Amino acid sequence: MSQQEDDLRALAKIMDFLRAVSIILVVMNVYWFCYEAIRLWGVDIGVVDRILMNFNRTAGLFHSILYTKLFAVLLLALSCLGTKGVKGEKITWGRIWTALAAGFVLFFLNWWILALPLPVEAVTGLYALTVGTGYVCLLMGGLWMSRLLKHNLMDDVFNNENESFMQETRLIESEYSGNLPTRFYYRKRWNNGWINVVNPFRASIVLGTPGSGKSYAVVNSFIKQQIEKGFSMYVYDFKFSDLSTIAYNHLLNHPEGYKVKPKFYVINFDDPRRSHRCNPIHPDFMEDITDAYESAYTIMLNLNKSWVQKQGDFFVESPIILFAAIIWYLKIFQNGKYCTFPHAIEFLNRRYEDIFPILTSYPELENYLSPFMDAWLGGAAEQLMGQIASAKIPLSRMISPQLYWVMSDSEFTLDINNPEEPKILCVGNNPDRQNIYGAALGLYNSRIVKLINKKGMLKSSVIIDELPTIYFKGLDNLIATARSNKVAVCLGFQDFSQLVRDYGDREAKVVMNTVGNIFSGQVVGETAKTLSERFGKVLQKRQSISINRQDVSTSINTQMDALIPPSKISGLTQGMFVGSVSDNFNERIKQKIFHCEIVVDAEKMKREEKAYKPIPVITDFADANGNDCMKEMVKANYRRIKEEVKQIVADELERIAGDENLKHLLQQK
């Protein structure tokens, strides 16, 4: 330890000596080039004069005003290089360069002062002042360099460098792929890359708070690319007609991807003119009573979201069973002539004294309705009325002439991926009426899912925007089985807590854990934590610095830490996404995780939108004189359905009364 201290003291003496010689050279420069003024001040040192004359004669030291200055600065630099000062966090390269620049200008660029037309004493004073000030500035800059903290840990306070990583830069295209161009940050610069969804059949989730760019950056691109590649498509358009307009116009402009050009269909309850008609409980697509039960189950849980958490409860199952029985009754009555959703609602709203004799007169429904009959026969009228009211009250909210119009006839079937008749179907909701329309549209969802998830059909896509606004029965099963049937599912919603609230904890977990492709814009809370855990950890550098008077000690270690921490996900800007994709056996993607900006050509999109055509009028309600009769025709359809149900009930009661084996049912009133 003593030897080390001696060495340090010796080094300090050498540095001091070099600095002293440097200062002497500066003084010599002033003495030589301002000699006239010095003599005027009465300074006459003959020995110094002779020494300087010898230096100049032998070495040419004073042939130029710069020589002594250059030697002085060289010795000053050596003295600063060997000096170890106390490190300071406030010393920056900016301060150092400022001091050095000022010193250089004052020290080297002041020769013109000697030629100023001023008194000799003034010129000498000014020259000496600039040389001295410049030297001090150079000295300060040199000393600050020795005190500079070379590892400033505060340069990356958000740990961006550790949490940036190389991402996929290849474009991997295939018959089914979706490809999104990106920009990502890695090693202090922005790079171009690609998100390659090479297997869309393993389902995709698009998350993000409102305004994070879900639809703009991801969902819209999926719709366009899948239409270009010949997918049949079902689009749930929560804010009709945003997505529907894109799908309609892109199909008009890119029909070349299809062997058989698909037809474009729209379900829109707000405007019957721009809506096709479709019966979601068409008898041809119901094979047994379980299909009727699924339809009743879907409609009831969409009307009563709280029932999702209470499945199996008595007052949840009772109205579902009753409504399923009515649907199946309409299926078997006159070969399903009146099997529509509006007819089922109207039938339910008849007196229960009329409903039960009619339903139980059919052997297929007798056992199905035995709990209701037991309550009726047992005198539990209040319980029975409560069960019926549990079905009537929510369904009565759906009594609407426009809704009856759309759902009471069929202009197309829901097998959208039929190779012989492919379809692009867009169903539109309205945020102001989402509870009512969402229930009806949920019925279309459940029927479509069952019809498209079959072997040998055309590749198809199911795109659901704002998933929590409808209850999508069978969603978990669709995700799990759709891959083998070439059904690409894309679900958009805001965060996982919405899914848990509206689908229940178990079903929400199945959805979250079975999707293969996930995109997330800004999300917070538990959703951000869940995603961060899904993306995993990476080995990151950790550096610590200890500063004392004599030295700086640095330690570097590594530890596993979150690749994309929740705080990063919570602070994503609009258009920035994190996520992961799945790959195939023959299309390997080494880096599946991404943290990037999805690049959207805004100018191109604006040009496309300007050229978009509105969805045309589908049904013309004009009469022979050109007058718009939409309201009259829609109301006439509404009255017709009510009258048909009244007539059905009257005819059925008459049939039962005339049948010796059944008329006892009427006596139970």
Show the residue positions of the predicted features:
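P-loop NTPase motor domains
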Residues: 150, 195-487, 503, 567-588, ...
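N-terminal charged/capping segments associated with class I S-adenosyl-L-methionine
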Residues: 592-596
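Hydrophobic alpha-helical segments involved in membrane association or supramolecular assembly
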Residues: 77-79, 442, 446, 517, ...
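Basic- and hydrophobic-enriched, low-structure N-terminal and domain-boundary segments
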Residues: 1-212, 216, 221, 547-549, ...
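N-terminal short leaders/motifs
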Residues: 171-190, 369-382, 517, 523-524
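A glycine-rich phosphate-binding loop feature that marks nucleotide/adenosyl-phosphate handling sites
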Residues: 158, 408-413, 548-551
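Conserved ATP-driven motor cores of ASCE-family P-loop NTPases powering translocation/secretion/packaging/pilus
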Residues: 479-481, 485-488, 492-582
